[in-house]
């Protein structure tokens, strides 16, 4: 868009000069001497890059002018890219990364939602308000305490331990079986 406006401005500034030259070529040479009236004199050639500086309404350009260069040209310094730093020759060369134009925000910003986007459930209208009844006069029932048997802590000696093993073996009892007599 900038280049288009620049071309239009250049044409607007140069067309009057070109039109004067074309009109001068069409007029027959009726003057014996080469003198022309003041309004018909051709202007000297002025390079285009001097013209905008002579007019005050152009002013200073606040935006940086960049020449048109091929994007994939590796010899052009890129101001918005991080140049890869290679410390060791066997290290992988990182890809160029985009850097942000400004510092990242330190605080996570919460989106401000418009009230129409906030979902508020509609209130339910109840016909009857149910109040739970609480019995304030409650009978206290005693809780039975579990019967516990007293436990005896005893120190086991190796002799007593071996005796307890011997005595804990099941004894075999012999019962005399007599055949029934009829």
Swiss-Prot record:
Signal peptide residue numbers: 1-20
Pfam families: Casein_kappa (PF00997)
Subcellular location per the Swiss-Prot or TrEMBL entry: Secreted
Top-rank taxon, per record: Eukaryota
Subunit comment: Heteromultimers composed of alpha-s1 casein and kappa casein linked by disulfide bonds.
Chain's role: Kappa-casein stabilizes micelle formation, preventing casein precipitation in milk.
Designated name of the protein: Kappa-casein
The organism of origin for this protein: Homo sapiens (Human)
